[in-house]
């Protein structure tokens, strides 16, 4: 199953997806550097055995604002959903993640997981995370979790003792943090483009791929032809 990659532009219109019986989707959402973005996304697993793998990464700095609202609805039994969102927030940027897993009464044998983790790079950056579960079935496996914090001081110290400068050590840890989302992309050419964009952002740069996205107000896929 190949992962689809979608770029989130400013004031993107709400998105609704329906997964029918046995359908499987793997999606990666990207808020590129230099973009303030807001997105409402609702995905309904309405057929038995449907499966969703949803990942996302947001990279914001300066005075950017990112607001992601994700609802994954389990309407039918035997469905699986996995969500992992990560953010790197610096400057005076603000990021908010609001995620809800809804499990209907008839959606027995549901497996649903949601995580959101954010790194703050400055004392003026702000992030909040509101993962929620609303469960009406009794035979389910569901969990959610969220963290907001700084880079690991012990890991930084270890890298510094190996002769790596402070700035380079910071970039290594930030890339390792974001790379879990990058690796969710199964198509090599798309994965390389996303990895390149993340690395340029961590060096304080915008590459051509990211720069061309900044004036878009929509959600659109990255394709190999772009």
Sequence positions of predicted segments:
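Conserved beta-strand/loop scaffold segments within soluble protein domains that form the structured core
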Residues: 1-157, 161-164, 178, 184-211, ...
């Amino acid at each position: 199953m190949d992962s689809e990659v979608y770029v989130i532009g400013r004031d993107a219109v709400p998105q609704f997806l329906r997964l029918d019986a046995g359908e499987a989707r793997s999606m990666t959402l990207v808020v590129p550097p230099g973009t303030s973005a807001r997105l409402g996304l609702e995905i309904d697993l309405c057929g038995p055995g449907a499966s969703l793998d949803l990942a996302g990464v947001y990279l914001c700095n300066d005075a950017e604002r990112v607001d992601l609202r994700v609802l994954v609805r389990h309407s039918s039994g035997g469905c699986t959903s996995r969500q992992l969102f990560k953010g790197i927030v610096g400057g005076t940027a603000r990021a908010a993640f609001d995620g809800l897993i809804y499990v209907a009464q008839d959606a027995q044998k549901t497996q649903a997981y949601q995580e959101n983790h954010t790194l703050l790079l400055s004392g003026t950056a702000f992030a909040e995370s509101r993962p929620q579960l609303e469960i009406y079935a009794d035979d389910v496996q569901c969990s959610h979790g969220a963290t907001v914090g700084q880079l690991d001081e012990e890991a930084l110290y270890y890298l510094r003792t190996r002769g790596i400068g402070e700035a380079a050590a910071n970039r290594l840890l930030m890339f390792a943090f974001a790379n879990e989302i990058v690796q969710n992309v199964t198509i090599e050419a798309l994965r390389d483009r996303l990895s390149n964009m993340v690395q340029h952002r961590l060096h304080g740069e915008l590459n051509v791929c990211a720069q061309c996205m900044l004036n878009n107000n929509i959600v659109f896929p990255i394709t190999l032809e772009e």
